Amino acid sequence: MYILDKLVVLLRLPKAVAGELVRLWTIDDHTYCDLVKSWLGYHPALMQDNYTLQTEDGITFYLGFGTYGKDYTSWSMDAKLEFNPAKVGNSRWFKNLYQMLIQRSKFIDFRRFDVAIDIPVPRSQLRLLKDNRKYTLLDYGGENRTEYSGVRSNHGQVKVYNKALEQGLETDLTRIEITVDYANSSWRE
C-alpha cells in the first residue's frame, strides 16, 4: 500500500489573510483550527511568521507567512502549508482552512511531497542500497533501525524504517518514504 505522506504547498496570498487568521486564533475561534505555537523565523530559507496548528482531532500541521528578508510592499505575501493529507484529510477545521487559502490565493505551487510505501515484512529483511548520495544509518538494535539516502527534505531522499515499532503494532510493517520535489521530477522517475 502507498499513500501521500506529506505535502508542501506554496501560496501567494493577500496580506490581510494572515492577519484575519491570527485574529481568529487569538479569540479561540475554531473555524480554521487551533493555534498550538508560533515563532519568528530569522533565516532566508524560512518563513517569517510560523505557526503549528491543530485540528479538532489533535493532529498538527504547519503554516508560515512571509519569506524572511523579502520585501512585501505590495498587497501579497508568500505562505507555506505543510501537512499530512492522510491525517488531516477528514478534519472539518483543516478543510475550512485549506479551502479558504486556495480560494484566496493568486498563486499555488504544490512544491514537494513524500510517497510512503508500507510493506508487511520485518525491518531486518529490507536494506537500502547505497549509492553516491549521503547515507545515514541510525541503528538502535534489533528491528529499530532507520536508513536514509539523500539530503533531508530534498528531491530523491529515501527513508526506510520500522513503521510497526513507531505505531506500536503487533504485526510486521516496514515503511519506505520517498521525497519528490515536483519541479525536479519527471514522469520517467
Regions found by a protein language model. Name each.
Residues M1-E189:
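Structured, helix-rich domain cores that form ligand/interaction pockets
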